[in-house]
């Protein structure tokens, strides 16, 4: 049976703004308080989805969340009508309103961790929504994320959904941004690679000193248990604390893997040789031939990697065995990174083409091509069981472009977040979107009695 990797990209929401909310994320911090363009941001994301679909890659779309999150503000003590809640939050606690308006759910690499059916004990595709408890503005996402994923993958025969892990620091879980999978074919058993920043319960593990390590070993282990993964199909690795302190807040900022290939920076991991040895041996036991492409620090510094988002790229496998690397425009603008990519594609290795996308609106908030997508490996029968309303087609692309142009503002600043009309605009847009994508009532405002 045929099998595919399907990339489900996050659709940028109507409240996309530069709130500077993500400590440890260099771009998010440095672009704080700039004016944003939600319409352009959504269009840039859709353009990438359409281009990859046109190239023959399986592509889907993941809906944004209702923002501002009025219910979250009510839990923090603001009362009155929805408009009054927003106005009172703006007057008394603007940072809380900014957080409640974040469109960060666009970075769906953090939405969940996904294990394909070939790896799991019960032969179903497993999803665990990420609790994202390190940052308040992201910690409020997972209830809606779970409902949206449930509406997309709504077939108990093929799909199993788990709620987020306990929302405490010991089980900090950032989803697929710290997870990748190696395999000889998407429908065959593979090796799942979990990368963590610290251990919550074992002080022998080192930890970063400046920025927080958002993923714990214990969270990764819990997800592997929930998904019914076998020990011979899992490798755990600790991310180098020194690179976390340089702005590598998720592993997908310093490495990317797909198929049998890991593309990584020399400084990405602790005990790199041992990690690569485990990956090589475990993949070999499943009939795969692991290939590691190391980018030396002499060619690309960690600072260059963070500024260009070289590793926050999409590594895509073609049917002929060659690979395409999808990178942001910022890679071409970095002389050392661009020189390295020229060498990479001319060496005769698996990566023989680089494709550039303008994702500036997302990049300025610290999210590149890899942040914007959630990968789901599916067999043909499983793909047929997915809600077909979320699969990207030329028709859906045109419909979504028109939807964006109708509902999204072309400029948004902090002061605009206090406008109650923005909530009305967002709910109107999302109500229409659920009909376009055939999701049903997944948003809180649609579920109120």
UniProtKB/Swiss-Prot annotation:
- Which GO molecular function annotations are given, in alphabetical order? N-succinylarginine dihydrolase activity
Record family assignment: Belongs to the succinylarginine dihydrolase family.
- GO BP annotations, alphabetical order: arginine catabolic process to glutamate; arginine catabolic process to succinate
Q: Which Gene3D superfamilies match?
A: Succinylarginine dihydrolase
The cross-references to PANTHER family, in alphabetical order and at most eight, read: N-SUCCINYLARGININE DIHYDROLASE
Q: How does it assemble?
A: Homodimer.
Q: Where is this region: Disordered?
A: 23-43
What does the UniProt record say this protein does? Catalyzes the hydrolysis of N(2)-succinylarginine into N(2)-succinylornithine, ammonia and CO(2).
Into which EC class is this enzyme placed? Answer: hydrolase
What pathway does the annotation place this protein in? Amino-acid degradation; L-arginine degradation via AST pathway; L-glutamate and succinate from L-arginine: step 2/5
Q: Does the keyword Hydrolase apply?
A: yes
Name recorded for this polypeptide: N-succinylarginine dihydrolase
Catalytic site positions: 174, 250, 371 (nucleophile)
Report biased composition (Polar residues) as residue ranges: 25-37
Matching Pfam families: AstB
Q: Does the keyword Transferase apply?
A: no
Q: What is its EC number?
A: 3.5.3.23
Q: Which residues bind substrate?
A: 19-28, 110, 137-138, 214, 252, 365
Q: Which UniProt keywords apply?
A: Arginine metabolism, Hydrolase
Spell out the reaction equation it catalyses.
N(2)-succinyl-L-arginine + 2 H2O + 2 H(+) = N(2)-succinyl-L-ornithine + 2 NH4(+) + CO2
